[in-house]
Amino acid sequence: MLICNDNLNQKTLLEEIMALRPWRKGPFEISKIKIDSEWDSSIKWDLVKNATSLKDKIVADVGCNNGYYLFKMLEHGPKSLVGFDPGVLVKKQFEFLAPFFDKEKKIIYKSLGVEDLNEKYPNAFDVIFCLGVLYHRKSPLETLKALYHALKIGGELVLDTLIIDSPLDIALCPKKTYAKMKNAYFIPSISALKGWCERVGFGDFEIISVLKTTPKEQRKTDFILGQSLEDFLDKKDHSKTLEGYDAPLRGYFKMLKSSSKR
């Protein structure tokens, strides 16, 4: 949890926090008020925080949401940090949080998507984190290509995506929704994902971890509006989504840009 012990008016603070719902990423604690977000993002961060050194590196978080991971990255001594997310509400959440967790104003927040990287940030970063974005993109290869071109030669990508458990080079393409998500388009096997990454130029593909999503990591709280994981799974068989697909399984990966070709 990210904690700030500034002494503030708790009633006013809580009103501000609740006006910014839903809080997807967190948790945070400000002046003893805990923002109990839908996702316990510390679980994911613990998996990827030591994937590569951030010390004195130029680092990006693509799909950064409200900045939770950016605030955690500050603890690892990067040279600079840039977050990218086109969402309006999550930027407002970041602007609310930054005075508490980025008091030296080291983080740059850009309201841009991954598709903007090619033109505006070629060969710009030593490390890119792209967590929970790929399966939301209609063209995963173009997304990986944009991430590739935004890295310097020798740069590293840390990627998290939904995956399917299969030895084949295949991807699940949900008919309408996956776990009630309308914007889940391609959910690859690890083998298929590795092939995609190699096709755009990445090498040294490494599996960091594979983890099932559980109610410990994602659940309903008072700080979100609406449903969460328990509502997305089959009531009688939690190994399946409501649509009958396998329940969410996430893979965490690291890979290297070894050349500027492609």
Swiss-Prot record:
Keywords tagged on the record: Transferase, tRNA processing
GO-annotated biological processes: tRNA wobble uridine modification
One annotated GO molecular function: transferase activity, transferring alkyl or aryl (other than methyl) groups
Residue pairs linked by disulfide bridges in the UniProt entry: none
EC number(s) per entry: 2.5.1.-
Xref: Gene3D superfamilies: Vaccinia Virus protein VP39
The reaction(s) this protein catalyses: carboxy-S-adenosyl-L-methionine + 5-hydroxyuridine(34) in tRNA = 5-carboxymethoxyuridine(34) in tRNA + S-adenosyl-L-homocysteine + H(+)
NCBIfam families, sorted: PRK15068.1, tRNA 5-methoxyuridine(34)/uridine 5-oxyacetic acid(34) synthase CmoB
Subunit structure comment from the entry: Homotetramer.
Protein name (Swiss-Prot/TrEMBL): tRNA U34 carboxymethyltransferase
Lineage: Bacteria, Pseudomonadati, Campylobacterota, Epsilonproteobacteria, Campylobacterales
Originating gene: cmoB
